[in-house]
From Swiss-Prot:
This is 4-hydroxy-3-methylbut-2-enyl diphosphate reductase. It catalyses: isopentenyl diphosphate + 2 oxidized [2Fe-2S]-[ferredoxin] + H2O = (2E)-4-hydroxy-3-methylbut-2-enyl diphosphate + 2 reduced [2Fe-2S]-[ferredoxin] + 2 H(+); dimethylallyl diphosphate + 2 oxidized [2Fe-2S]-[ferredoxin] + H2O = (2E)-4-hydroxy-3-methylbut-2-enyl diphosphate + 2 reduced [2Fe-2S]-[ferredoxin] + 2 H(+). Its cofactor is [4Fe-4S] cluster. Catalyzes the conversion of 1-hydroxy-2-methyl-2-(E)-butenyl 4-diphosphate (HMBPP) into a mixture of isopentenyl diphosphate (IPP) and dimethylallyl diphosphate (DMAPP). Acts in the terminal step of the DOXP/MEP pathway for isoprenoid precursor biosynthesis. One of its GO terms (biological process) is dimethylallyl diphosphate biosynthetic process. One of its GO terms (molecular function) is 4-hydroxy-3-methylbut-2-enyl diphosphate reductase activity. Isopentenyl diphosphate binds at H41, H74, H124, S226, S227, N228, S270. It is an enzyme of class 1 (oxidoreductase). The keyword Manganese does not apply. It comes from Acinetobacter baumannii (strain ATCC 17978 / DSM 105126 / CIP 53.77 / LMG 1025 / NCDC KC755 / 5377). Dimethylallyl diphosphate binds at H41, H74, H124, S226, S227, N228, S270. The keyword Protease does not apply.
């Protein structure tokens, strides 16, 4: 059996930054450090941070007064921001800058009284945060659609003053279809010059497309609640390949690889490289050859830590 590695794969700049914020806060201020929601959607990462003293909570009412709280990479609503400010909590915001960009777009549309449509998955923390950034005081509203059927059923109050934004971790192909449906139904709709799907999502979907063309089976290392990891698995399946989403090597089943010549391995943007190495080692234990990595797009984007945390680090 051959192992073929997608390139790029694994951590993106936003995930790197979010994890670094939690680690730096733990170093500078000591545990407990509270984190609203999983800072990134990966069980291994969250469990590791929890062991170091991070306390993950669902809502701010679980955070004691005078505590430090970190907002996850997925972003939060204005209501959450305002509650933290009202309570005087010390906040470090790990929201991915590319999610913040969408928040800025939504805030601008609300201020103008332009209604907004968010393309995204209901219940995802990023969607909840983005929807909650829209202030309805100017008479507009924000609507959520996931697919073309949602667009067909959608009724808005002001179709002549309408814009769309997207969740950053969607399927590129599916999102293009939804945008086409929106433009067909609402010819005057505004949108970003380039959709809001982030560079890492785009690159990893391009890489898994290349991987699936060359392999019989595709493994995606990532947690079940990771949106971008699920999109990678779905993309490989749409290309006619057996594809499996696994949190770690222990979830692999040897029967998946009967009569398999080439196994493709990739990882979602919140999966650390150590998990990929463990998957490769398990496959090699079962007789696979040393992995070969495909050529891919180089990623050299980095995001800086919040200014206030950099100051605390310097003082420490």
């Amino acid at each position: 059996m051959e192992i073929v590695l997608a390139n790029p794969r694994g951590f993106c700049a936003g995930v790197d930054r979010a994890i670094a914020i939690v680690n730096r806060a733990l170093e500078c201020f000591n545990p407990p450090i509270y984190v609203r929601h999983e800072v990134v959607h990966n069980k291994f990462v969250v469990d590791d941070l929890r062991q170091r003293g991070a306390v993950f909570v669902d809502e701010l009412d679980q955070v004691p007064d005078d505590s430090i709280v970190i907002f996850s990479a997925h972003g939060v609503s204005k209501a959450v921001q305002q509650e933290a400010e009202r309570r005087g909590l010390k906040v470090f915001d790990a929201t991915c800058p590319l999610v913040t960009k969408v928040h800025i777009e939504v805030t601008k549309y609300a201020r103008e009284g332009t209604e907004a449509i968010l393309i995204g998955h209901e219940g995802h923390p990023e969607v909840e945060g983005t929807m909650g950034q829209y202030d309805k005081l100017k008479g507009g509203d924000i609507y959520l659609v996931e697919d073309e059927a949602d667009v067909a059923a959608l009724e808005v109050r002001h179709p002549e003053k309408l814009a769309f934004v997207t969740q950053t971790t969607l399927s590129i192909d599916d999102t293009a279809k939804v945008i086409d449906a929106l433009r067909a139904k609402f010819p005057n709709i505004q949108g970003p010059r380039k959709d809001d799907i982030c560079y890492a999502t785009q690159n990893r979907q391009d890489a898994v497309r290349d991987l699936a063309e060359k392999c019989d089976v595709v493994l995606v290392v990532g947690s079940p609640n990771s949106s971008n990891s699920n999109r990678l698995r779905e993309l490989a399946e749409r290309m006619g390949k057996a594809a499996y989403l696994v949190d770690n090597a222990d979830q692999l089943e040897q029967s998946w690889f009967n009569d398999t010549c080439k196994i493709g391995v990739t990882a979602g943007a919140s999966a650390p490289e150590i998990l990929i190495k463990q998957v490769i080692q398990r496959l090699q234990d079962w007789g696979a050859q040393a992995p070969k990595e495909l050529e891919g797009r180089e990623e050299n984007i980095t995001f800086s830590l919040p200014k206030e945390l950099r100051i605390h680090v310097t003082q420490a």
